[in-house]
Amino acid sequence: MNNDKTILSVAVTLVLLGSIFFVIERVLARGRNRAQPIIRKGWVTDIVYWFTTILLTKPFVRLMLFLPLSVLILAKVTSLDVLKMGAYTGFGPLSRQPIWLQAIEIYLIVDFCGYWNHRMFHNGRWWPFHAVHHSSEDLDWLGSLRVHPVNDLVNKMVQVTPVLLMGYNPTVTLSTAPILTFYAIFIHANVNWDFGPLRSVIATPVFHRWHHSREPEAWDKNFAGLLPIWDILFGTYYMPKDRWPENFGICEPMPKGYFGQLWEPFASNFRNSKKTDP
C-alpha cells in the first residue's frame, strides 16, 4: 500500500468513527453528556495524533515486537522462516486451547498488564509522557489517541510481550486488538454512561472520564482499560454516584501543538533533574 492510500485509509477511518461517535455523543447521549462544541480546543492536534500514531508509531511498535519474538527464536521455540511464512501458531499447552478461551485469557492478561503499566506512567519521570494524554480539557472520542509515542510504545510492549512469551497464538492476539482499540476510544467519549448494574464489572465512559478528572479525589484512580476489578482489588476504584466528571486536563502547563507536546516530557524531565542536582 502506498503512502497516499495509507493516508486515505486513516482519513476514511476518522470519517467513519466521527459519524459513529456523532450519533453516540450528540444523539443517543443527548442530555447525558458534557456541554462542549464539536469543533473544540485541541481538535487539530488530536487529528495529527491520529495520523502520526497510525502511520508512524504503530509500525515502530510492530518492529519492536521482534524483540520478544527473537527470544522465542533463540530459545528454538520457532524459527525466522516460520515467522516469515506466517505459520507460527504459538507453543505449549496455552496455544492448544480453543480460540475463544485463548481470547478471553488474552483480554485478562492484556488488561492486567495495562493496569500496572498505567499506574507506572502516573509516577516519577514517566508522568510527563502520560500527561500529554491527560492534557485534553474537552475530552471526547477524538482525544483518545492523544498519546505520546513513548507512552504508546511502552504500553504496547508491556501488554503484548507476556502474551507472546506465554505461547498464545499470535493470530488470536492480533484479533483482540481491534476490539480493545475501539473500546479504548469509546470510554473517552463525551457521554455520561455508567451501564447501571454493570458499572463495577466493565469500564465505562464515566469510569474512565473520572480518571481524566482534575478533581483531587479522582487523581490516580480508575487505571483499568476494560475491567474495573483491578482497581477494586488494588484500591484505586472511584465511581461516585451523585455526580458526573466535568473538569478535565492537567494542573501543569502543556504546549497546545503536536511537536511541542512531543518535546515537553523530555524538557520537563530535564528541568526536574536540574532542580534535584546538588
Model-found features: residue ranges?
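Membrane-helix interface linkers and caps
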Residues: S19-V48, P68-F91
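Generic structural signal of hydrophobic/aromatic residues within well-ordered alpha-helices
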Residues: V23-I24, A35, L67-S70, L198, ...
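A transmembrane-helix-recognition feature enriched in membrane-embedded lipid enzymes
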Residues: D46, W50-F51, G225-L233, Q261-S273
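Hydrophobic transmembrane alpha-helical segments in integral membrane proteins
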Residues: M1-L16
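Generic detection of long, well-ordered alpha-helical segments
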Residues: S9-T13, P37, K41, V172, ...
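A membrane-cytosol interface segment of integral membrane proteins
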Residues: P245-P278
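Membrane-embedded catalytic scaffold of the fatty acid hydroxylase/desaturase
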Residues: F51-L65, L74-A75, L80-L83, Y88-E246
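Membrane-water interface of alpha-helical transmembrane segments
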Residues: D4, L8, I39-T45, G167, ...
